[in-house]
Design a protein with these regions (language model features):
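Metal-cofactor-binding active-site regions of metalloenzymes
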Residues: 4-26, 43-50
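Histidine/acidic residue-rich metal-binding segments in metalloenzymes
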Residues: 25-205
């Protein structure tokens, strides 16, 4: 990309990396980020058992290495172990409709992961960007961290501002499935909390 953009790009741009298939060599690659124009790296606390998942030890190492090179760490914050358990419980009970996507991804699993990510980033003094925040419990964790002066930012998405979990109850499976996303859609009180956080500058994207 940098080769193709050289002498052609008319705007400033940066590249965004994502960790998959954890191996020791990725930490050497992070050291090369500045030269390659990569200013941020995204990790997933969810999706345990998949190549996307990053455990806490690896997350901590990525935070340390990112701080050393001046990169911001983006995080998808959900407690993957609890999500796997809740999903397996739904499957055992035959609860397979889109409604149970929300049941298996409750707000506390996001809030706990947000709190943990903030704490680990604080221990390494690494800038943290919390992607697609959805619930008031997670917003409260962000507010506490920013109140201490920690370098942490939060974003949300349009669908979390405008759509609530009730759409997952549509009896038409195909229609309800259109609204399956992770983290899951929340309730009206969460929508309102997100709007307030945006209006007050707590959420910045």
């Amino acid at each position: 990309i940098n080769v193709r953009a050289k002498d052609k790009a008319c705007v400033d741009f940066a590249l965004h990396a994502m960790v998959t298939y954890i191996m020791d060599s990725i930490f050497d690659e992070i050291e090369d980020f500045p030269r390659r124009g990569i200013s941020s790296i995204k990790i997933f606390m969810a999706y345990n058992g998949s190549p996307l998942h990053v455990d806490d030890g690896t997350f901590f190492r990525i935070l340390e290495k990112s701080r050393q090179v001046g990169a911001t760490v983006f995080v998808h914050a959900e407690n993957g172990e609890i999500l796997n358990f809740l999903r397996s419980e739904c499957v055992k009970k035959g609860q397979l409709t889109p409604h149970y996507h929300y049941v298996s991804r409750p707000p506390f699993t996001e809030a706990e992961a947000v709190r943990r990510a903030i704490y680990l980033a604080g221990q390494t003094d690494t800038p943290l960007y919390i992607a697609h925040m959805t619930c008031r419990e997670a917003i409260a964790e962000l507010q506490k961290a920013k109140g201490t002066g920690q370098r942490v930012s939060g974003e949300t998405c349009t669908h979390y501002l405008t759509t609530t979990k009730e759409v997952l109850d549509n009896p038409d499976f195909n229609e309800a499935a259109k609204f399956v996303c992770s983290p899951a859609l929340r309730d009206q009180e969460d929508c309102e909390a997100l709007w307030q956080a945006l209006a007050g500058g707590l959420l910045t994207a």
